[in-house]
């Protein structure tokens, strides 16, 4: 969830189990996501889908993750480590310089987009952390009730 999902999505290869669920739930706490979700989610799933999931905090199932291209492999939960190790072995046995030359430009592309988007998203995250909706979400969490958002 949130930052954890973003970190996973920034990995070179993502192996997920069938019960895996990703979500960026900042919005459910009245906060704009500012941890990189606005960078990687649109790149992997497309802008419209990313907007939906980031604006709603809706969960993305393992099957959806695979269908949308957010994960490379979907396996049974008890096979995650084995599949990840098999992927690592395959890459380790490959031509290191060619593999690096293939991924470095992609990482550079992601870094360039991050440099454009992250300052604004972090600023907006900070701004929304002080909003009445964020205060209400925190209060509701402590009181174990659903928040009632009202800031428009």
Task: Label each region the model flagged.
Residues 137-152:
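Short, basic/aromatic-enriched C-terminal tail that caps enzymatic domains
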Residues 15-20, 71-119, 123-132, 148-152:
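C-terminal long alpha-helix characteristic of the crotonase
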Residues 18, 47-51, 60-67, 94-100:
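Short, structured loop/turn "capping" segments at alpha-beta junctions
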Residues 12-13, 52, 56-58, 64, ...:
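Well-ordered beta-strand positions
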Residues 37-40, 49, 61, 101, ...:
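Hydrophobic alpha-helical segments typical of transmembrane helices
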Residues 2-4, 59, 78, 135:
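Glycine-rich phosphate-binding loop at the start of an alpha helix
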Residues 1-55, 68, 83-87:
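CoA-thioester-processing core
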């Amino acid at each position: 969830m949130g930052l954890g999902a973003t970190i996973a999505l920034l990995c070179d290869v993502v192996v997920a189990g069938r019960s895996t669920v990703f979500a960026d739930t900042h919005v459910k706490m009245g906060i704009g996501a500012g941890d990189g979700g606005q960078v990687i989610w649109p790149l992997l799933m497309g802008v419209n889908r990313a907007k939906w999931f980031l604006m709603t905090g809706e969960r993305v199932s393992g099957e959806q993750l695979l269908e949308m291209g957010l994960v490379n492999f979907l396996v049974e939960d008890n096979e995650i480590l084995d599949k990840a190790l098999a992927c690592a072995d395959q890459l380790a046995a490959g031509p290191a310089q060619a593999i690096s030359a293939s991924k470095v430009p992609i990482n550079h592309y992601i870094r360039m987009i991050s440099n454009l988007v992250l300052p604004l998203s972090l600023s907006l995250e900070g701004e929304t952390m002080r909003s009445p909706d964020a205060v209400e979400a925190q209060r509701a969490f402590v009181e174990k009730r659903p928040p009632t958002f009202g800031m428009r």
